[in-house]
């Protein structure tokens, strides 16, 4: 079996990235090595590596409520690129819980990278 182990994301300023992701993920880093410029967080079963030399990647984080998360981040001065919206309705369980809407929003992290926030909600009527 193959599983996703780690995602690397570019960070010019590791201290700034550390503060941003500590607040966003609600946890302290799992590891910090400078030099050479590596900052690790645990995100479920996947390591998030913030590294000076990494290319920019796009990550998606599952949150309980994308609308509430966006409002909290906006209050902290985070740039919201795209407001929460329904991206997909799941009829079966291939990509998400059946009978749910997948809502996404996009923001810029402290290093200018695009980050997606995702939550699932029961399909709304109408």
Label every model-predicted segment:
Residues 2, 8-48, 68:
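Core segments of cupin and vicinal oxygen chelate
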Residues 14, 61-114, 121-123:
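Vicinal oxygen chelate
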Residues 1-15, 57-59, 118-126:
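N-terminal beta-strand motif that seeds the catalytic metal site of vicinal oxygen chelate
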Residues 1-3, 51-56, 98-99:
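Short glycine-enriched loop/turn motifs at secondary-structure junctions
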Residues 28-33, 83-85, 119:
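Conserved catalytic-core motifs of GNAT/GCN5-like acyltransferases
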Residues 40-44, 52, 107-110, 120:
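Active-site beta-strand termini and strand-to-loop segments that position acidic
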Residues 37-39, 57, 101-105:
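Short beta-strand micro-motifs in enzyme catalytic cores
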